[in-house]
Amino acid sequence: MAFKHQLILSTAILLAVLAAASASFREQCVPGREITYESLNARREYAVRQTCGYYLSAERQKRRCCDELSKVPELCWCEVLRILMDRRVTKEGVVKDSLLQDMSRCKKLTREFIAGIVGRE
């Protein structure tokens, strides 16, 4: 009987720890905290340059993108790319369309490019 209670208690503690870790992860990968607005814009500019052919210094943009990404914890990298491709949150907390919404001509190519970046990791 004592073993059963100990097992239930251990399971409850484990579930509480997992729930706390999950909440902490969700709170950490939020624009404005670990994910800076500057880093989102740096990645947008680099992705657009690579796929849409706009003339910007490719090396400078790549360096800026990588520098900004290095400031974000690795566990948030996929969230950064998801925000870049699907939606964004302004400094005021307003949810907007994708940072690439205005690039409809290049959006598909840019999505493929971003998917390739994630696939390389």
UniProtKB/Swiss-Prot annotation:
What Gene Ontology molecular function terms does this protein carry? serine-type endopeptidase inhibitor activity
By its UniProt entry, which CDD domains does this protein fall under?
Answer: AAI_SS
Q: Tell me which positions the record assigns to the signal sequence.
A: 1-24
Key words, A-Z: Protease inhibitor, Secreted, Serine protease inhibitor, Signal
A GO cellular component annotation here is: extracellular region
InterPro entries given for it? Bifun_inhib/LTP/seed_sf (IPR036312), Bifunc_inhib/LTP/seed_store (IPR016140)
Question: Can you name this protein?
Answer: Trypsin/alpha-amylase inhibitor CMX2
Organism of provenance: Triticum aestivum (Wheat)
